[in-house]
Design a protein with these regions (language model features):
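Residue-level "edge-of-site" marker
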Residues: 41, 162, 192
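Short, flexible active-site-adjacent loop segments at beta-strand->alpha-helix junctions, enriched
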Residues: 107-109, 165, 193
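Conserved "HGTGT" condensation-loop signature of ketosynthase/thiolase-family condensing enzymes
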Residues: 1-157, 177-180
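Short loop-beta-helix segment that forms the pyridoxal 5′-phosphate
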Residues: 157-163
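Internal active-site segments that recognize and position negatively charged phosphoryl groups
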Residues: 174
């Protein structure tokens, strides 16, 4: 069996150090830390009160209001990074065979923010089991890969890797192998949390 050559043609990222590859890489070279005080919730009862959060995140810069409400922040981050990678690669303009382009994305937990919101609302409510109809679609670990595929019309291999902190690495390896063994011509891969 002849193995296909695999190359990286585009990259994207949305991190505490930068919201794109150039700003991330620049901060990395300068030794900047992405850690800071937790701002997403009241952490005063916890011993650790710092985390690596994406600062100044505004979903409306990337999604319309309706779409943003249907996506957990983890999926928003992954989709934005994937858009950057697809744009840099020129894949969308290359008119690929959409049946031969896939998406494999990793997430250790998935929509934890959504889970926390829904459970908190339930616990503080009147006891009636009312949940947002988008609760499950927002929090499942494969919604990021699915959304990226739907956005571009990719119909190749599509799934999520869930293997704790190794999720994104496993997703990248699976995407590499999909190309290497001829199951796809191009793959969008990475991870989000």
């Amino acid at each position: 069996m002849e193995l296909n050559r695999v190359v990286i043609t585009g990259m994207g990222c949305l991190t505490p150090l930068g919201k794109d590859v150039p700003s991330f890489f620049d901060a990395l070279k300068r030794g900047v830390s992405g850690a800071g005080p937790i701002t997403r919730f009241d952490a005063s009862k916890f011993k650790t009160q710092f985390a690596c959060e994406i600062k100044d995140w505004d979903p409306s810069e990337h999604f319309d209001r309706k779409e943003a409400r249907k996506l957990d922040p983890y999926a928003q981050y992954g989709i934005v990074a994937a858009r950057q990678a697809v744009a840099q690669s020129g894949l969308a303009e290359a008119n690929p065979d959409l049946d031969r382009v896939g998406v494999i994305f990793g997430s250790g937990i998935g929509g934890l923010f959504t889970f926390q919101q829904e459970i908190t609302a339930f616990a503080q409510g009147d006891g009636t089991p009312r949940f947002n109809p988008f609760f499950i679609p927002k929090m499942i670990g494969d919604i990021c890969a699915g959304h990226i595929s739907m956005e571009y019309g990719f119909r190749g291999p599509n799934y999520a890797c869930v293997s704790a902190c190794a999720s994104a690495t496993n997703a990248i390896i699976d995407a590499f192998n999909a190309i290497r063994y001829g199951k796809a011509d191009a793959m969008i891969s990475g991870g989000a949390e």
